[in-house]
C-alpha cells in the first residue's frame, strides 16, 4: 500500500471516529432529555413512575406516567440541545443539496436553508413547550398534525417556485424538492424519536440504516453481479437482498436483547382491583417495540405476541427498503448534477447528506408511519409518551 492510500484510509478513519463520538454524545443528550422510558437517568430507581390501567369501549390501556414533575424543566432543557444539533445537521443537508442545484444563486440557497432551520428549530421548541408544560390533547395533536402537513406542502411549493426561476425541468424540480422534503421530515422525525421515544429508539433506527448500508455494500462487492439500477452500478440486487435479510436478523436480535427486563423493575399498577395481564409491557420492558413499531395499536390479547413479531419483521423489511431507496435516490441526484459528493464538509467522507442519505428516507418513513398510525388508531397521540394498549375485554380482579 502506497503512502497516498495510507493517508486516505487514515483521514477516513479519523472522520469516522469523530462522527462516532458525536453520535455517542447525541445519544447521551437524548437520554438526558428522555424521562419517559425506563432507561432514563431521571428514573434511576426504576420506580419513579406509575402505570395506570384504564378501560373504555372494551379496550384496556396501560398508561405510563412520570411522577416527579420537577424533571420536566430539566428534560426540556436537554431537548433544546437535541433540537439545535438536529437543526444544524438538517440545515447543512438542505444547504448542500441546494448549493449544488442552484449553483449560481448562493443567496437563494442560503435563504432556503435558513427557512428550513427556522421551521425546524422554532417549531419543535414550541412543540416541546406544550409537551412538557401544558397538556398535549387531541385538539393540540390535530392542530400540530395540520401545521406539519401545511409546512411540508408550503415548503414543497417554495422549493419548486425557487427552482422555476432557473432552467431546470419541472420533472427534475419535483425530484430535487422531494430530496429536500425528505431532509426536512427526517429532521423533525429525528428530534421526535430522540426526545419523545428515547435514545434507544433512535439508536435502533440508526443501527438499521448502518446495517443495511454495510451489508449491502459487503455482499454486493463480493457476490454482486446484477446492477440494481443503472445510475449506481456499484449497487446490486444481490447486495440489496442479502443486506435486507442480514438487517432483519440483526435488528430482530437487538429487539430481543431490548426485550430482556435488565435493570427494569416489575411494572406496578396504581389499581387494587386488578391488572391487565396480557399487555405489551409484559413483552416490551424497555418500551422499544411500542415506541418504534406501534404494534400495540393494531393487535392485542392472546394473539398479540405472535402478531407483534410478524409485524415487527415486516416493518424492519420495509424500513430497509426505504433506506436503500434513499441511498439510490440521492445517488440519482448526484448523477444528474454531475458530482461525486454533495460537499467536503466531512473530508474524505464527503458531505453530511452523503452520510445520511439512507437515514433521511428511513426516518421519514417511520415518522410518517407514526403520524398516520396514531391518527388512525385514535389511541396514542403523536407526542404522548409510551402508552400501551391491549384488546382485552375485561380486567381480572
From Swiss-Prot:
It catalyses: a 1,2-diacyl-sn-glycero-3-phosphate + CTP + H(+) = a CDP-1,2-diacyl-sn-glycerol + diphosphate. GO terms for cellular component: plasma membrane. Keywords: Cell membrane, Lipid biosynthesis, Lipid metabolism, Membrane, Nucleotidyltransferase, Phospholipid biosynthesis, Phospholipid metabolism, Transferase, Transmembrane, Transmembrane helix. The keyword Nucleotidyltransferase applies. It is a multi-pass membrane protein. The keyword Cell membrane applies. Disruption phenotype: Not essential, it can be deleted. One of its GO terms (biological process) is CDP-diacylglycerol biosynthetic process. It is an enzyme of class 2 (transferase). InterPro entries: PC_trans, PC_Trfase_euk. Its EC number is 2.7.7.41. It is found in: Cell membrane. Signal peptide: none annotated. The chain crosses the membrane at residues 13-33, 78-98, 114-134, 143-163, 176-196, 199-219, 244-264, 288-310, 317-339, 356-376. Pathway: Phospholipid metabolism; CDP-diacylglycerol biosynthesis; CDP-diacylglycerol from sn-glycerol 3-phosphate: step 3/3. It comes from the Bacteria. GO terms for molecular function: phosphatidate cytidylyltransferase activity. Belongs to the CDS family. This is Putative phosphatidate cytidylyltransferase. It comes from Mycoplasma genitalium (strain ATCC 33530 / DSM 19775 / NCTC 10195 / G37) (Mycoplasmoides genitalium).
Amino acid at each position: 500500500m502506497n503512502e497516498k492510500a495510507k493517508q486516505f484510509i487514515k483521514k477516513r478513519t479519523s472522520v469516522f471516529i469523530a462522527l462516532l463520538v458525536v453520535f455517542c454524545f447525541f445519544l447521551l443528550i437524548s437520554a438526558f432529555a428522555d424521562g419517559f422510558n425506563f432507561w432514563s437517568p431521571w428514573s434511576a430507581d426504576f420506580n419513579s413512575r406509575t402505570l395506570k390501567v384504564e378501560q373504555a369501549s372494551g379496550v384496556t390501556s396501560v398508561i405510563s406516567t412520570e411522577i416527579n414533575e420537577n424533571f420536566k424543566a430539566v428534560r426540556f432543557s436537554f431537548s433544546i440541545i437535541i433540537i439545535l444539533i438536529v437543526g444544524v445537521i438538517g440545515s447543512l443537508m438542505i444547504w448542500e443539496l441546494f448549493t449544488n442545484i442552484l449553483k449560481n444563486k448562493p443567496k437563494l440557497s442560503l435563504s432556503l436553508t435558513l427557512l428550513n432551520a427556522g421551521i425546524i428549530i422554532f417549531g419543535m421548541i414550541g412543540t416541546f413547550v406544550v409537551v412538557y408544560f401544558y397538556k398535549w390533547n387531541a385538539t393540540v395533536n390535530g392542530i400540530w398534525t395540520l401545521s406539519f402537513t401545511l409546512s411540508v406542502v408550503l415548503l414543497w411549493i417554495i422549493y419548486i417556485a425557487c427552482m422555476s426561476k432557473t432552467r431546470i425541468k419541472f420533472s427534475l424540480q419535483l425530484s430535487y424538492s422531494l430530496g429536500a422534503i425528505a431532509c426536512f421530515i427526517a429532521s423533525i422525525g429525528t428530534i421526535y424519536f430522540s426526545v419523545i421515544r428515547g435514545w434507544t429508539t433512535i439508536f435502533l433506527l440508526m443501527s438499521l440504516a448502518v446495517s443495511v448500508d454495510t451489508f449491502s455494500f459487503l455482499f454486493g462487492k463480493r457476490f454482486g453481479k446484477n446492477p440494481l439500477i443503472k445510475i449506481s452500478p456499484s449497487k446490486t440486487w444481490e447486495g440489496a437482498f442479502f443486506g435486507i435479510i442480514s438487517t432483519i436478523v440483526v435488528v430482530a436480535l437487538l429487539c430481543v436483547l431490548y426485550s430482556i427486563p435488565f435493570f427494569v423493575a416489575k411494572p406496578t399498577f396504581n389499581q387494587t382491583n386488578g391488572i391487565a395481564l396480557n399487555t405489551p409491557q409484559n413483552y416490551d420492558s424497555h418500551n422499544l417495540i411500542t415506541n418504534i413499531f406501534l404494534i400495540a395499536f393494531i393487535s392485542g390479547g392472546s394473539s398479540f405476541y405472535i402478531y407483534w413479531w410478524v409485524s415487527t419483521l415486516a416493518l424492519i423489511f420495509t424500513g430497509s427498503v426505504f433506506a436503500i431507496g434513499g441511498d439510490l435516490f440521492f445517488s440519482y441526484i448526484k448523477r444528474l448534477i454531475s458530482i461525486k459528493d454533495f460537499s467536503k464538509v466531512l473530508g474524505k467522507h464527503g458531505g453530511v447528506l452523503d452520510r445520511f442519505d439512507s437515514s433521511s428516507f428511513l426516518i421519514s418513513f417511520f415518522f410518517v408511519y407514526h403520524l398516520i398510525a396514531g391518527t388512525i388508531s385514535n389511541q396514542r397521540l403523536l407526542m404522548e409518551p409510551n402508552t400501551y394498549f391491549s384488546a382485552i375485554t375485561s380486567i381480572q380482579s
